[in-house]
Amino acid sequence: MGEIEQKPTPASRLGAPENSGISTLERGQKPPPTPSGKLMTVKIQMLDDTQEAFEVPQRAPGKVLFDAVCNHLNLVEGDYFGLEFPDHRKIVVWLDLLKPIVKQIRRPKHVVVKFVVKFFPPDHTQLQEELTRYLFALQVKQDLAQGRLTCNDTSAALLISHIVQSEIGDFDEALDREHLAKNKYVPQQDALEDRIMEFHHSHVGQTPAESDFQLLEVARRLEMYGIRLHPAKDREGTKINLAVANTGILVFQGFTKINAFNWAKVRKLSFKRKRFLIKLRPDVNSSYQDTLEFLMAGRDFCKSFWKICVEHHAFFRLFEEPKPKPKPVLFSRGSSFRFSGRTQKQVLDYVKEGGHKKVQFERKHSKIHSTRSLVSQPTAPNSEVPKQSPQSASLTFGEGTESPGGQSCQQAKETKACTLELGPHQSPALPKSPPGSKAADGTTVVPPEEEEEEEGGKDGIRPSNPQPPQPSTGSLTGSPHLSELSINSQGGAAPANVTLSPNLSPDNKQASPLISPLLNDQACPRTDDEEEGRRKRFPTDKAYYIAKEVSTTERTYLKDLEVIASWFQSTVSKEDSMPEALKSLIFPNFEPLHKFHTNFLKEIEQRLALWEGRSNAHVRGDYQRIGDVMLKNIQGMKHLAAHLWKHSEALEALETSIKGSRRLEHFCRDFELQKVCYLPLNTFLLRPLHRLMHYKHVLERLCKHHPPNHADFRDCRAALAEITEMVAQLHGTMIKMENFQKLHELKKDLIGIDNLVTPGREFIRLGSLSKLSGKGLQQRMFFLFNDVLLYTSRGLTASNQFKVHGQLPLYGMTIEESEEEWGVPHCLTLRGQRQSIIVAASSRSEMEKWMEDIQMAIDLAEKSNGPTPELLASSPPDNKSPDEATAADQESEDDLSASRTSLERQAPHRGNTMVHVCWHRSTSVSMVDFSIAVENQLSGNLLRKFKNSNGWQKLWVVFTNFCLFFYKSHQDSHPLASLPLLGYSLTIPSESENIHKDYVFKLHFKSHVYYFRAESEYTFERWMEVIRSATSSASRAHILSHKESHLY
């Protein structure tokens, strides 16, 4: 990582000398070997709000990281502290000292681990070290500011006065007022200012160490000292909060303690799913054993609280760490979690028995010398205690400090790197296990009376991680021509990834998502030198590559026209399933377009051939332009406007005919399953309208690129004016037809619903949310329209469709955040006139998107004529087969866990629709996103490379509908594989990946990594632009303004 500046650590700011680690091993013991392998960097936020970066081996247990932090702080009594972080489910948990770090902190770059107090002893005099008491004082200060430590005004003022005394010394009215103005210790501090100064005046002569001691003396008497509330409900459904302390388990209503269960009374702690159970010991006069039951938000919240209780019981009640449970011979039951570390008694004995010496040091904002105990260690002959000025020696709260190099720290938020390496052949130096441990590795187990009563299956669907990673390969799509579909689940700051590739096989072998035999490394071999030489013959002018984009996308557009004009027409002619009136409306309006654009493509390719220098015409420069070709053909398109106007009518007529004819419905469904129909059929009917918009964007780029005096500028500007006029005329039709097409597409994914497509209804957003029900959080697909919100589940139906469970009219609905109320991250409460539901999103950003769109839809509904008509069908629709209806009716809450493994069934329904992708990735897509996707279509040749391969493979790639479709060449009639991009990360390879090529971008999720090479800087930027539109979504305000400036 290079040289790291030596900035003061929290311990050095207290004046503690640096040492090589405090040995806590028994005499004669050796430290356990440090795991070798790749290092990972973990950011730790200290109690003074600074951040430190630690490098530890990925496979090392959590104890390695925790000991590294304690060693960095020179902290002897580290057992009172812990490391907490939000896991992949967004639940704040403690770092398990026995499990590998990489299995707990899955995305260390995006997680900040907090070093905080974990165990609060009943008496602060049990804390032997001044540094320990100082860190406890910082924790009290933090809890005050965050509202965790609630108390009356007098207690708050007294606490703050001790903090001020330790920070700035004796009372001085002017200095006090200035300091209190700059530092806010509680939210309503202004009203307490006079009382704070009154108390501070009485602390004259009190040293910082004495101030910390007095601060803890006051704090420990408060009811909420060291209390962390966990939302729950009792058997009657009353909302309460559970907490654990050194004395036992506490029950709060709000911030008022209403009950307590002392450890001496507790016989057993367990949990089943989301039920937390406390078995009490029988009274002296009774043999009856009472069992108390509390309901928490979900299984993960319940297990997290159970672990905290186990650790508190072991730390405060046991004399030594519990012995490991013997491993079962055949079957195991319960959790493998166990307490690891020293108990409080062991910590007290160790500090009392250890050899210590007094060392002088300087404290923050004070020149008073104090003493601190350190384990006796040999010191270098010339070593000195570091001396620091009050400005640079203090823990920084709101002011910068200067490092030795002269760089300013950003208000105590700087990140320091602590590389734990002693030398080129040494493992990181870390503190070792404490004496009193029965084993060198510090392994412990939970006492038998605290075992977990966990049922065999892990049920329940968690909002931020709906499916564990599956090593097998499987098909999400019902289309046999799609060789692959890889999916991952998002999370805010994000979340765990899931791979769902073709044909879930029973052998559970990991396969690459792109498994088509024509897409492997052996196919289409090309050496890098050959490719480089070929690319260098191309012109370097950006206008050439813009013109080439017209050519490549025109090829794809022509193929899309052939789907209707050739393939669909040929299939229809073989079967008498379509009315003649419908045939005459569709095909005569596509054939002229196909003929025109075939000639248009030939002209563009001829011009590019001349531009590339395959004749001597390019010497004169007459053919190094494209504007004249664009102007001529766009003027020709205006004569085809009558056919373009008919496409909306054809789409409506087709859907009307399908609704009235079951035979035509089955015919169209069968055609959609053919390889050539890689998108929903009705999407191809709108392609001509979409293409006009693409011409407009290309001409805008050309006009922006050319200077006004360029030979091609005038033609490009004239062509842009012509196409802009056509787009403006079709703008209203486009908006209407996109919504109409999307409603009919959604209708095919839903069962149990009537009249979804009605005049005036507009689709707004679809996506996956978790609904809180009697069985916990259950995954549901939600569909938001401008008048109603539907929620569905995916059951074990033969068609892979989603069954509608309920509808919530938006008229009169309210929406509010309820994360604190239910203790579920990213939680919302939707209150309708007839029904209220609680849902949770997979991330904060997802929650905000839903809140924004639902509120907008509510506002639209309020302006309408009133409540929406009933949508739910009382019986399955007539056009569904009896088998489908029966299977749909049998779907229940209990089917949901099984529905996730039902992907291996081949269904007659398309399985690669955006509804299914959003279901598996726990994300959402809005109608605005679909509109943006229409504008961001691209195709062309790319070189593809797998993570572990050497050669590059040339593929023809089409990006449309949030997905990459792969072809062996542009002449292929259908794609060989597809890759939906929702949830993927788009980056540029780092130097460590050894790509060493220009214009390379990287797509990755989980262990799947793909590298793609473009042929020029322009094409590289264009691929990055369009793919980024699918892997990230902008805010609604930004997108609406974008659409207004690009009317179509």
Swiss-Prot record:
Modified residues (Phosphoserine): 20, 23, 340, 373, 389, 403, 427, 433, 437, 512, 516, 836, 875, 881, 892, 899, 902
Tissues expressing the protein: Detected in brain cortex, hippocampus, striatum, olfactory bulb, cerebellum and hindbrain (at protein level).
Protease as UniProt keyword: no
Limits of the FERM domain: 40-320
Organism domain of life: Eukaryota
Composition-biased stretches (Polar residues): 371-395, 472-491, 498-513
Alphabetized InterPro entries for the sequence: Band_41_domain (IPR019749), DBL_dom_sf (IPR035899), DH_dom (IPR000219), Ez/rad/moesin-like (IPR000798), FA (IPR014847), FARP1/FARP2/FRMD7_FERM_C (IPR041788), FERM/acyl-CoA-bd_prot_sf (IPR014352), FERM_2 (IPR035963)
Job description of the protein: Functions as a guanine nucleotide exchange factor for RAC1. May play a role in semaphorin signaling. Plays a role in the assembly and disassembly of dendritic filopodia, the formation of dendritic spines, regulation of dendrite length and ultimately the formation of synapses.
Name of the protein in question: FERM, ARHGEF and pleckstrin domain-containing protein 1
Provenance organism: Mus musculus (Mouse)
